[in-house]
């Protein structure tokens, strides 16, 4: 089997300038990445930014620790990948053998990582996630054990410290559980577009549960965007096959909206399949890319990463400040006020972030 490559974050320095956050160690994921680019790429970099499923994942992957053969154990045990059923079973088994390691010191090397975790069992392979521009460690990596029992031993130990820093090992298989995404953000929508027209268009993809039409709290007029929640996840997948949709007389930009809980899960563990993984897998089977979705872990405000999950700027020029905990979008209408009032039909209120 060929090695699956862990890509880098994309141009972290450029993203920092684009989003307008502080310099230094803040290299978080940039929400200004378009959904289309996100589906075709991996995780992006930017200061204090959220993610719309990532940015570029690839970059300079030849640096130390940028590659890992996620299928080594399968080959060592004499397995073949002759059928989709076997492929899925083998992938599920490998989930039991691998771990995500967060909170690493910037000085921790691949050798340090392997030496430490070898105390718990044979390490088949490991990697550190590196910034493709600077070559600097991004503070997390992955370990593949020979046996799942080694993972259990790691988890049984209450605290792990490497190079003087408490680290955070997690089971990689935890990434498999995720809530379905049923909500979208529609930008570039004319405030004059009737709700009936919006419902008619998007109802063609599946049953609409609710439509939120944000109002300007000063003018009491509708803003140039809305949120739509569907009964099921499938309509969202269909809609996201195109970045732009013509709704009434408006050419609208569509992005996936997520609850805070969904967003945090996506940032830490990523999505297997669905929107972000769609372009990365091979055929109908699960992707072999270990790093799929993990690369934005550092955006969780964890340890030295220091990136709070709120207050992200930039999402194609949308500003959700004050809109009932919807944030991370930037300013679509170039107005400074929050959104306050919302005209809503059915459903329940929640706090959402971009995907």
Curated annotation (Swiss-Prot):
InterPro entries: CARG-binding_factor_N, Nucleotide-bd_a/b_plait_sf, RBD_domain_sf, RRM_dom. The modification Dimethylated arginine is found at residue 345. It comes from the Eukaryota. GO terms for molecular function: chromatin binding; histone deacetylase binding; minor groove of adenine-thymine-rich DNA binding; mRNA 3'-UTR AU-rich region binding; RNA binding; telomeric DNA binding. GO terms for cellular component: chromatin; cytosol; glutamatergic synapse; mCRD-mediated mRNA stability complex; nucleoplasm; nucleus; postsynaptic density; ribonucleoprotein complex. Residues 64-73 have a biased composition (Basic and acidic residues). The modification Asymmetric dimethylarginine is found at residue 345. The modification Phosphothreonine is found at residues 91, 127, 193. The modification N6-acetyllysine is found at residues 165, 243, 251. Residues 1-92 are annotated as: Disordered. The keyword Ribonucleoprotein applies. There is a cross-link at residues 72, 129, 197 (Glycyl lysine isopeptide (Lys-Gly) (interchain with G-Cter in SUMO2)). Keywords: Acetylation, Biological rhythms, Cytoplasm, DNA-binding, Isopeptide bond, Methylation, Nucleus, Phosphoprotein, Repeat, Ribonucleoprotein, RNA-binding, Transcription, Transcription regulation, Ubl conjugation. GO terms for biological process: 3'-UTR-mediated mRNA destabilization; cellular response to amino acid stimulus; cellular response to estradiol stimulus; cellular response to nitric oxide; cellular response to putrescine; cerebellum development; circadian regulation of translation; CRD-mediated mRNA stabilization. The modification N-acetylserine is found at residue 2. It is found in: Nucleus; Cytoplasm. Residues 11-20, 27-42 have a biased composition (Low complexity). Binds with high affinity to RNA molecules that contain AU-rich elements (AREs) found within the 3'-UTR of many proto-oncogenes and cytokine mRNAs. Also binds to double- and single-stranded DNA sequences in a specific manner and functions a transcription factor. Each of the RNA-binding domains specifically can bind solely to a single-stranded non-monotonous 5'-UUAG-3' sequence and also weaker to the single-stranded 5'-TTAGGG-3' telomeric DNA repeat. Binds RNA oligonucleotides with 5'-UUAGGG-3' repeats more tightly than the telomeric single-stranded DNA 5'-TTAGGG-3' repeats. This is Heterogeneous nuclear ribonucleoprotein D0. It comes from Homo sapiens.
